[in-house]
Amino acid sequence: MTLAEANVGEEYIVRDIDADGDEELIDFLFSLGCYSGEPITVVSRKKSGCVVSIKDGRYNIDNDLAAAILV
């Protein structure tokens, strides 16, 4: 399942990043603390994306980015 399909308020574990070899995207997510084995929670959803909680931070990510995060 992708983060775009995840339920709001539930904690998930990141299984993988499906970035199709896009190292810039992988590096960006890694800088947020989003990598395999880390917990992630969808805090809320908007039409353009969602707000996620990773470690001690909250981040607004778009739908394409959420679809690349496998949980």
Language model segments and positions:
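Short, structured beta-strand/loop micro-motifs enriched in basic residues and often containing a Trp
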Residues: 11-25
